[in-house]
Regions:
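Surface-exposed patches in mature extracellular/periplasmic domains of secreted proteins
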Residues: 5-8, 75-82
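N-terminal capping segments
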Residues: 1, 5-62
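Mid-length scaffold segments of soluble, non-membrane domains
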Residues: 57-73
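Structural motif
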Residues: 94-98
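Short alpha-helical patches at coil-to-helix transitions and adjacent helical residues
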Residues: 58-62, 93, 151
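Histidine-centered active-site/metal-ligand motif
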Residues: 104-105
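Aromatic- and glycine-rich peptidoglycan recognition patches
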Residues: 79-90, 109-158
Length: 158
C-alpha cells in the first residue's frame, strides 16, 4: 500500500495545496490551523452534507474522484452515477474508471494485477485503517460481492 499525503475528511474536496495551506491557517476556523482530516461514521453517512466539518481539511472518497476527474465541485457517491455510464463487464475497466457502491464508497481503478483479473490496483480516500488517500491492491470478488459496480465518467477520453 502506498499512502499519499492528504488525509480523509468526510465531505472534503481540498486540493493538496489547499490541504497544506489550511493546516497552517484556516479562514473558516478564524485563522487557526484546521485539523488534518476526520473520520467517516454511520452517523455522518446518515446526515450527509449536514455532517461536514468546517474545522477539518482533507478529501473524502467522492471528493477524491471528483478532483481526479477535474470536476468543478465534489459530487457525492449518490451523484457520481449520473455523470457515468455503467460498464457491461468488470473486464472492460480502464485507468480512471470507478468502482462504486452508491451512497457508501467509491474508488478509482488503475490497472489489473495479473491475467486472471481478480485483483487490481486502485486508489481511494479513506477508509480504515489509514484514513488518507492511498493506492492498494483490491479483490474483485470481494467488491463484487459487496455491491460495487464498474462505471466510466461520460467525459473520459481515450
Amino acid at each position: 500500500q502506498r499512502c499519499i499525503r492528504d488525509r480523509y475528511k468526510w465531505g472534503g474536496f481540498d486540493t493538496p495545496r489547499q490541504f497544506a495551506e489550511r493546516l497552517k491557517a484556516d479562514a473558516a476556523n478564524g485563522g487557526a490551523p484546521a485539523a488534518a482530516g476526520d473520520m467517516g461514521t454511520p452517523e455522518k453517512q446518515a446526515a450527509g452534507d449536514a455532517a461536514v466539518s468546517r474545522f477539518a481539511a482533507g478529501v473524502d472518497c467522492s471528493g477524491f474522484v471528483s478532483r481526479c476527474w477535474r470536476l468543478s465541485r465534489r459530487f457525492s457517491t449518490r451523484e457520481l452515477p449520473a455523470l457515468s455510464i455503467s460498464l457491461p463487464s468488470w473486464d472492460e475497466l480502464k485507468t480512471g474508471d470507478i468502482l462504486i457502491a452508491p451512497g457508501r464508497h467509491v474508488l478509482l481503478f488503475i490497472r489489473w494485477e495479473g491475467a486472471e483479473k481478480d485483483r487490481f490496483l486502485g486508489s481511494e480516500a479513506g477508509p480504515l485503517p489509514v484514513w488518507k488517500c492511498a493506492e492498494r491492491v483490491f479483490s474483485r470478488p470481494m467488491l463484487e460481492n459487496s455491491g460495487y459496480r464498474p462505471m466510466r465518467y461520460r467525459g473520459m477520453r481515450d
